[in-house]
Amino acid sequence: MSNAPLANQSLQDFVARHQRLFVLTGAGCSTNSGIPDYRDSHGNWKRTQPVNFQAFMSEEHTRRRYWARSLIGWRRFGQARPNDAHHALARLEANGRCGMLLTQNVDRLHQSAGHRQVIDLHGRLDLVRCMGCGAKTPRSEFQDTLGRANAEWLALDASDAPDGDADLEHADFSSFKVPACEACGGILKPDVVFFGENVPRDVVATAQDHLSQADAMLIVGSSLMVYSGFRFVQAAAQRQIPIAAVNLGRTRADDLLTLKVEERCEAALAFLL
């Protein structure tokens, strides 16, 4: 840690002072891995809001649109690799300073970097779940199933959007075929928490339990505009433990922070490598 840039000395000191950090990460942690984020530096949406849970479950055309875009977007998302921010946080854990990492991301890049204690708050995009029988299938296998059913779509390309989505604009999705669950015929959905869907209670309870044992909180790459993540910062503030954030631009918790570093995640955390 002694070779860190002078500008990040305050963050180094914060990490050095605490033994049981609870780390909360967001989309900004993965942008350098080629995965776009949702919001700009002011916390506003860069694109239209992501698909809504109720619409996905009730509207066939919404499911067609989602899976058509995902068929294109998964090709690059599934190849994403951890960047220096992920590796730095894994090193923090290896050094015994991180009690738990709670990520709002669904890309599993923390695990790929070797981080062991990780809670996927919003689920994981590498699995597909049947909403009927609960059966789970690897997303890579479902990609093959989608491709076989929609071979004519495989030649399409589009710019990447967050979380394995692709900006397929002005496409006619009416011909896109969405396979049903082979076991029960149920609706297949990525094993992630959509907007309008609740985070499972046991996941929240487990995260809160780990937070109760922490002596400080470190936020990395999140504007905290979504309440599912922000509530943990509120809980930390209520416990009166120090809270530091690394994020470009404003966060919903700016008035609760002990320290804020407005720098790219991988640069701010470089002293951990």
Curated annotation (Swiss-Prot):
Disulfide bonds: none
GO cellular component, one term: cytoplasm
Keywords recorded for this protein, A-Z: Cytoplasm, Metal-binding, NAD, Transferase, Zinc
Database matches in CDD domains: SIRT4 (cd01409)
Signal peptide coordinates: none
Cofactor(s) listed in the protein's UniProt record: Zn(2+)
Enzyme category, top tier: transferase
GO MF: histone deacetylase activity, NAD-dependent; NAD+ binding; zinc ion binding
Phosphoprotein keyword on record: no
Domain Deacetylase sirtuin-type: start-end pairs: 1-273
Domain of life: Bacteria
Cofactor binding comment, as recorded: Binds 1 zinc ion per subunit.
Family: Belongs to the sirtuin family. Class II subfamily.
Protein name: NAD-dependent protein deacetylase 2
Gene transcribed to yield this protein: cobB2
